[in-house]
């Protein structure tokens, strides 16, 4: 739908989802995060068209650290979800130039699926998620939690 509308994806943002209150998901390690894709019609905005394991690692660490400052601990399921959001953003950027919205839905779905699968492999998606999950966040990440909420932004 994003490509059919001629939009570009300028960001993928982590956001706690409504599943956080779901009793059957709570404590299972399943994702309770959503990836919010910020999309615009602006054709001048640069979007990433390449991804590496190192770049995906950086994106996921930034997400994890940001969420930790909000006192949210990421599970493997959360990181898998957030990583897929970043890869979807790259896939949209790569496919945008050659996208043919007149194709049948099944053809468009196959093209998008193949592009995403190639990015998953190229970025070593599952391995990167495991690496990010194993990194111990410094205590200072949690010590600064709530600073923004207590600062002048909301005064």
Task: Describe each model-derived feature in a short phrase.
Residues 1-155:
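S-adenosyl-L-methionine-dependent nucleic acid methyltransferase catalytic domains
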């Amino acid at each position: 739908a994003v490509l059919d509308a001629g939009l570009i994806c300028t960001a993928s943002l982590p956001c706690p989802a409504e599943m956080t209150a779901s009793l059957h998901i709570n404590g299972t390690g399943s994702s309770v995060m959503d990836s919010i894709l910020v999309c615009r019609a602006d054709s001048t905005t640069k979007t990433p068209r390449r991804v590496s394991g190192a770049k995906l690692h950086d994106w996921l660490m930034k997400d994890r650290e940001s969420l930790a400052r909000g006192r949210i601990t990421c599970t493997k399921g959360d990181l898998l979800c957030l990583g897929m959001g970043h890869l979807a953003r790259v896939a949209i950027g790569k496919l945008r130039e050659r996208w043919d919205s007149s194709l049948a839905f099944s053809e468009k779905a196959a093209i998008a699926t193949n592009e995403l699968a190639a990015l998953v492999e190229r970025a070593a998606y599952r391995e990167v998620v495991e690496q990010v999950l194993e990194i111990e966040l410094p205590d200072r990440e949690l010590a600064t939690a709530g600073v923004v909420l207590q600062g002048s932004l909301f005064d």
